[in-house]
């Protein structure tokens, strides 16, 4: 089996949301841009998804995985257990499943989601940064779940401490201190980005807006997704590279393309789960596949195919933009590291979605992984 002597994170199942008659991806030579010539010993693992029996319909050549997934998982589980053990007056609302026999399964799901996201999207992060990013993601997923499934979407959670940047909950005080100790320069940006996500979500809840007149309207709404500041702050914190605003300014278009691709991938891979929850618990469907299906009066399979084709178009634009930077001799080392970190997020986001249990259990085309 591949990687048997390396700390690959175990995979169980993967899935393809479209199926065997999917369109082929564009032929783009990302490998020539991002292949490392001299790989350091502490480098992330490079995974070739098809060797692991993960369906990989994309022009992206590989994904990378952090070696520190065990530490990330332990940190995430520790935080959610500490929060859930608090009195209700101290920790605010919890996901509804925490109140009954579904508690363990829900904790496992949240931790798996956060760890998977952290180790594939931010693979070059140090062990401490992986732990803190896993916890950050878990807090966002935890809060998001309360907002989506709560009766009013106005319930307070521990994440509301990030809005004021003055934590009251003892676990949030500890988290703030650990982030700032790890990186006093980039840490505040990560904490503020979590606060922006929480605050914006209350004012512009995606769960309250699920009808769009045009596809362009939907895509514009998602391009300004409430998660975008966090997505970018997490990349910067994970890489640990401190850059001036002048050094990061040239990458605005590359960042935007990364966000666009991430949104399309998320919508494509989460569609079946969203539709199931719409039928069973009256959940809202905020999804490009659904918008295409309704506006164009096409069946779900065709809407998924169109969504995947749109992601291919973004990959073409991303390749052109990243080629411009990676072949530019004027690019300094810090800027190059950031471009590579963005590419890791692009590939990692796809792998994360394709192997995530909370999505694969609703899928039709599921495969056992080989790890």
Curated annotation (Swiss-Prot):
Its cofactor is Mg(2+). (2E,6E)-farnesyl diphosphate binds at residues 358-359. InterPro entries: Isoprenoid_synthase_dom_sf (IPR008949). GO terms for molecular function: lyase activity; metal ion binding. Disruption phenotype: Abolishes the production of the spirocyclic sesquiterpene alpha-acorenol. Its EC number is 4.2.3.-. A motif (D(D/E)XX(D/E) motif) lies at residues 144-148. Mg(2+) 2 binds at residue 144. Signal peptide: none annotated. The 2 conserved active-site motifs D(D/E)XX(D/E) and NSE are required for coordinating the divalent metal ions that stabilize the PPi moiety of the substrate. Belongs to the terpene synthase family. This is Terpene cyclase 6. It comes from Gibberella fujikuroi (strain CBS 195.34 / IMI 58289 / NRRL A-6831).
